[in-house]
Amino acid sequence: QHWSYGWLPG
């Protein structure tokens, strides 16, 4: 599962 938390690239 690929997700991003605003200022955290992921």
Swiss-Prot record:
Keywords: Amidation, Hormone, Pyrrolidone carboxylic acid, Secreted. InterPro entries: GnRH. The keyword Secreted applies. The modification Pyrrolidone carboxylic acid is found at Q1. Pfam families: GnRH. It is found in: Secreted. One of its GO terms (molecular function) is hormone activity. Disulfide bonds: none annotated. GO terms for cellular component: extracellular region. Stimulates the secretion of gonadotropins; it stimulates the secretion of both luteinizing and follicle-stimulating hormones. Belongs to the GnRH family. This is Gonadoliberin-3. It comes from Oncorhynchus keta (Chum salmon). The lineage of its organism: Eukaryota, Metazoa, Chordata, Craniata, Vertebrata. The gene is gnrh3.
